[in-house]
Amino acid sequence: MPKFRQTSEIIKLMAKKQDIRDVGIIAHIDHGKTTMTDSLLAEAGLLSPKIAGEARALDYLEEEQKRGITIKTANISLLHEIEGTPYVVNLIDTPGHVDFTGKVTRALRAIDGVVVVVDAVEEVMVQTETVTKQALEERVRPVLFINKVDRLIGELKLNSDQVQSKLLRVIRDFNNLIDLYGEQEHKEKWRVDPAKGTVAFGSALHRWGFTVDLAQQKGIKFSDVVEAYQKERWQELQKTIPLHDAILSMVVKNLPNPVEAQKYRVPKIWKGELESEIGQAMLKCDENGPTVICLTSAQMDPHAGLVATGRTFSGSIREGDRIYLVGAKKDYRVQQVSMYMGAFREVVDRIAAGNISALLGLDL
């Protein structure tokens, strides 16, 4: 789908909070979250499919490209349609390296759900546990993508039964993290289960993936995937079970919209009085209430200056609005409001509660 068509449609849909998903991607380093994101961008028409997985489109800082890791939080708004209904998925690609867990925590404040990416060969690692624990502490709901299934077949030479056995162990270990760190009222519902569509399997590098329900719709079995690699026909999987469909459908169907999420997240992440006008507006994700934005990051643009990224929890933000920065204890005039499209920003007139925005004019 071409970029500009998507941008215009996304702007219209931003007002429909029930059709918004604010989600992040978290993982142990090198488990493939940025490669997965590149595949999603390729489908959106923002990246050539030929270089998806190699371009590192959200790693737009020179240091990130050079070191091959994601350091600062990057953002993209994607359009995904299910049964004729379009949804906006505001996607954040977060750091996976142990040195940058503070940036992960800030990013988690802005989102309501996460796709946790786990390497099928390496399985759940220390940093997987660290970032999953952080997400659960912020009341951010997880779903699971088990990546690099191709390595189980191509490198380890596992058969269909052996592949499934290894994947079930990853799911078990991941659910153990939810049991260990999840809050009592959420952990049972948030445990991932392939039968419920909260687990996807695939290869981000080869751009295919599926959930159980998607595989049933397409008539695909694990043995078909194994055979595709054994006969070197894995490219066919990109067409039959494209990765973007599995990931975005899993996100839309299982992760909460801002109205649902803020009811239980605001009491955890906001220390103000919930019965106040601001508190009630945040709990309801009310775009007509007082404007409250949680700023999660800032980076320097050589042309525009400092760009602040934030999630609007209530109210709305327009160019020319004056906002008070609690940390700086000072008013600032918003010079520009935009939405993210990878390394680029699309200027918009207004961004309402429940959405992620980029703001110019704030001196953080």
Where are these regions (language model features)?
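Structural and coupling elements of P-loop NTPases
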Residues: 1-364
